UniProtKB/Swiss-Prot annotation:
Source species, domain of life: Eukaryota
Name by which UniProt lists this protein: Protein PAG1
Signal peptide range: 1-50
GO cellular component: plasma membrane; side of membrane
Gene3D superfamilies per UniProt: Variant Surface Glycoprotein, subunit A domain 1
Species of the source: Trypanosoma brucei brucei
Length: 405
């Protein structure tokens, strides 16, 4: 009898222990399925993803200064074209046709033909190409500004998602969340309102040239080299960042998983549906199947729409600028050669005060100090060579040319 009582008590005790153990297992399972979802959520690395985004944003904003400088230079080249026309006209009419020179160059007909030929190139650059260059410049600056804004917007949301406690952040390093002073290519360091660098902050922009605007250089800014291309902070097992967590109770839906991937920065990163935000890597953010919870785009210029558009508009501007620069060089060299031949044919030897190019300074065109004085002196020379009647005909031809300018 005593043995039965003891056996009953042991059985009852074991049953209680089993029930207790089952409760513990249920609780543990609950936290594994729910609570640990947020515990796994990683954060974007400060030295990797965040700095790459800010570097790219600053480069895109620097497009404004780049376009402004190139447009100004091209405009100056056209002005030098105009000055060249004036100077060549003056110097040609000074070569007296019947004083041992080539009559074709010194006749009114020869002058008019020469100016019409070279003047048409000036008109094409000034009226068509320069106008188009300005338009393409506006488009390039606008597209680059939109792209920079998308990246800034992403940084602003993710950086501000943090708690004062250690380890609760969405952008940071192994110790703490990222501060403004750690992202100086994004934020104004002297601002207390999380203000970003704007196009007007020219002294904060980088000096860029064509070599900095290639597809390769832009992609290099956004290439993650550390951690095997992982955009997440690898020294923090859990940053408790719900922005990388797309499961129920994460940063997007309270009771359900997201049905599709989530894109940030127009696709610079992609969050897998029902991902816990723990595994990160580099790949195609718009691929049909995402391997990583958090994927960083491997080819941003091609696959991120705002960056692709910014690059495309910028290349249009750069290509047209290169064409104008080449045309200026070729036309200037051609003019100088023809003028030099004319001087040789007339037996007149030029010096530094008369030649079109100053070889010592290397300047392609002579900029006139007083355009009106030169024009008046040139007209008197034309009248002296051609006679009053013929000068009227020449002036009509030249007047048509001036209308083109």
């Amino acid at each position: 009898m005593v043995s039965l009582i003891i056996l009953f008590r042991l059985t009852f005790a074991i049953a209680n222990r089993v029930r207790t153990l089952m409760k513990v297992l249920v609780i543990v399972s609950f936290f594994v399925l729910t609570g640990s979802a947020s515990a796994d959520s990683g954060a974007l690395s400060l030295s990797g993803a965040a700095e790459a985004l800010c570097n790219a944003s600053k480069r895109l904003k620097s497009v404004y200064a780049f376009v402004q400088a190139k447009t100004k230079y091209a405009t100056e080249k056209v002005r030098e074209f105009e000055d060249m026309v004036e100077l060549v006209r003056l110097k040609i009419v000074r070569v007296r046709g019947n004083e041992g020179g080539n009559g074709n160059w010194t006749s009114c007909t020869g002058i008019a033909k020469f100016l019409k030929r070279v003047g048409s190139k000036v008109n094409r650059v000034k009226r068509r190409e320069l106008k188009r260059l300005r338009y393409l410049g506006y488009s390039a600056v606008g597209a680059a500004g939109i792209a920079a804004g998308r990246l800034d917007e992403m940084i602003n949301v993710w950086r501000r998602a943090y708690s004062s406690g250690k380890g609760d952040f969405c952008v940071g390093n192994s110790e703490h969340h990222a501060t403004r002073n750690q992202l100086l290519n994004c934020y104004l360091s002297d601002s207390e309102k999380d203000e970003f660098i704007s196009l007007g902050d020219m002294h904060r922009m980088e000096r860029v040239e064509e070599m900095n605007m290639t597809r390769e250089s832009m992609n290099e800014l956004l290439r993650l080299t550390g951690g095997g291309g992982n955009p997440l902070e690898r020294y923090v097992h859990s940053a408790n960042c719900h922005l990388t967590n797309t499961r129920p109770g994460g940063g997007y839906l309270s009771e359900n998983s997201t049905s599709r991937r989530i894109l940030w920065g127009d696709g610079i990163i992609s969050l897998k549906r029902s991902g816990r935000g723990f595994v990160g890597g580099t790949g195609k953010t718009r691929a049909e199947v995402l391997i990583h919870d958090v994927t960083w785009e491997e080819d941003p210029v091609n696959n991120v729409p705002v960056l692709r558009n910014a690059y495309r508009e910028l290349r249009k501007f750069v290509n047209l600028y290169a064409y104008i620069e080449e045309l200026a060089h070729e036309t200037g060299a051609h003019w100088n050669w023809e003028y030099a031949q004319a001087i040789v044919n007339t037996g007149t030897h030029g010096n530094k005060s008369t030649v079109v190019v100053d070889e010592d300074s290397g300047k392609s065109f002579v900029v006139l100090g007083n355009r009106e004085t030169v024009q008046e002196e040139k007209l008197l020379e034309e009248m002296a060579i051609c006679g009053v009647g013929r000068a009227d005909s020449l002036r009509r031809t030249l007047a048509l040319l001036f209308l083109l300018f």
